[in-house]
Each structure stands twice: as structure tokens, then as C-alpha cells.
């Protein structure tokens, strides 16, 4: 079962100790409203900082503490005017991406604080997102939930390993992965493996496993339409062997998701990898339930 996104929440207050004491209730009320709305909605787990940011020291300490707790992203909440440098320090030491949130309250300059903090982050080259409005409104809450879900997706990619069987297919630039960009943007390690490994491993698949799969397919799919040339029973058995080989190579190499070039080396001289694409992406095969593994072919970038 997939986990929920985890969103860290950090409230920002005035940097003057006396003013902070006067306004902390307003700032905390804004934080509490966001937390209560997310908890009632149930789609996002929250980790709330135990105190409000009102100094350089607390900005660094509290943002680092949220990051250590494994949040996918951090929401900065503004109920009154907070010194923008606090947000800059928190962003430099916390876990991004960052969502700046303020209510549209004419009595207090939370919106002004959010805009000033956003300007500070822009000056530092720190990309961020903003949401303005009452979190009790569905459209505002939905923006926060969507942000958290996207942040979880990006966070989950960090440290993953992509297995690239073969290289660019059919001359398509737009379907070719840049190893440097994926590592820089997502933290994904791209491991190149030759398609000949599929052929080698396919020859080692036991005949009884091939026949088991063949019988399962012919008995359970809606129709298997053989012909005398491109799709014979033996060709289906070859496709089964290739799927079993890809499944084993994926497990042995610790790949989280994969791509297979296929055209034209595999499709012309051995078989297409369509059956592999179908069952690697499914939560089952002839051996029963299994974890899906994203496979694209030809080697189209799956992101």
C-alpha cells in the first residue's frame, strides 16, 4: 500500500520579541487551520513544527528538524508580517519544494509577508509555489493537497535506479533520457544495460516455466490469434522467455523502472517486447500477484 504524502508545516512570525508575543496567537491560528483542514481531508499526513519561527536561529533549527523527520515538502504559513530573511534561511536549510500560504485577511498583512518572502526566495534562485485564501474553501485546500502529492512523487524518485536496455529507438530525440538531467533534477541513477542480456537470460528460462505461461495465456486471454509468419506459437514462447528474462534482470540489478529499445534489433531478429511491457506493468502474471514495474518500449522516457 502506498504511503500518503508527508507535508511539513512551519509558521512564521515577527522578528521583534515583543511584537511576536502580541501576534503569536494570530500566526498559530493560521497554522492550526491548515493542519485541521488537512487532517480532516485525510489525503496528506502532516508534521508540524513545535513552535513558530521568530528568529534566524529558530528558522534554521525548525526547518532542519522537519527535514530530518522525512517530510516530502514544507509549507510556510503567514498570518502576520514575518521577516522575509526567516523564510530564506528556512528554505536554505529545510526540505523543498516549498509552498508559501497566506489567508486573505485584510486585518493582518499575511499576504504581504508571503509576497515579501517569495521575493526573497526568487532573489536566491529558490523555486517555490504559492497559495492564497481560506483553507476551508475546497479550491484552496485542493491546491495544497495537489502540491503535497506532486512533492511526494518527486521525493520518491530520489535514489531510484532506471534500467535502460539498449539506447535511442527509431531516432527519437524526445524519447531519449539525459542521465545528467535526471540525476540533477530527480536524483535518479540511469544504468545502461545491453539488450543482448535479455537474449542471454532468455535462453536460461526453464522449459516448464515457458509452458506454464503459454498455457495460462492461451486459457485466460480473450483471444490468441496466431498466423504462419510473424506470430506463431514458438514466437509467443520466445516473448514469454524475454519477459521472464527482463523480470529477472530487473530484480537482479535492483531497477525501479526500465525501458527497452526493442526496434529494430529485438523486433526484427528475435521478437517484440510488447508482452513484456504488458506484464511488467501489471500487478500479476502467471505466477500470481506481484509488484508492478514500469516498463516503456521503445525506450521512451516514462516521466
Region spans (language model):
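An N-terminal assembly and electron-transfer interface module characteristic of large anaerobic redox
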Residues: 1-303
